Regions:
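Short, non-transmembrane alpha-helical segments in secretory-pathway proteins
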Residues: 8-41, 76-109
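Conserved histidines in hydrophobic membrane contexts and catalytic metal-binding motifs
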Residues: 29, 46-72, 79, 88-145
Length: 145
């Protein structure tokens, strides 16, 4: 029975790497950033892969804990030090008027914390908008892929 349970667990973990990455990132954020109440998870792939856990710390401050793919480096950003996820989405909707927003992720681009919004243009083409977390300014725009 133990062997069957172990085999099922290994199979389930192998089939669900995103859940494994999320669980690992939450554990790192809780240990190194004193994250108390996780409420979001983002996976960012650009020049490198980053996992971000959002939530509240022990002082009840909103934080983002940005973790590199290896899990050996974590950086904490106060949510109040930049634009919110909703602000990033609002800017995307108002300036780009997309057909549909497909995804939004928090990550690191050119050593800056960023929001990356993936959307479909009105013509249905894939687009990427990268916004500076601290200023909300556009860092990169890739359109009509």
């Amino acid at each position: 029975m133990v062997i069957i349970g172990s085999m099922w667990f290994i199979y389930h973990q192998a089939r669900n790497p995103a859940a494994t990455a999320e669980t690992r990132a939450i554990n790192i954020a809780q240990k190194y950033a004193k994250l108390q109440h996780p409420d979001g998870f983002y996976t960012y792939h650009r020049n490198a892969t980053y996992y971000t856990v959002s939530g509240k710390d022990v002082d009840n401050h909103g934080i983002f804990v940005l973790i590199n793919e290896k899990g050996n480096h974590a950086t904490v950003y106060r949510q109040s030090s930049g634009i919110s996820k909703n602000d990033a989405l609002e800017k995307t909707w108002s300036t780009k008027k997309p057909q549909k927003v497909l995804n939004i992720n928090f990550g690191l681009y050119q050593s800056k914390p960023v929001w990356e919004i993936v959307y479909r243009s009105v013509k249905g083409r894939l687009c990427y908008l990268t916004l500076d977390f601290k200023t909300g300014n556009t860092i990169q725009l890739i359109e009509n892929i």
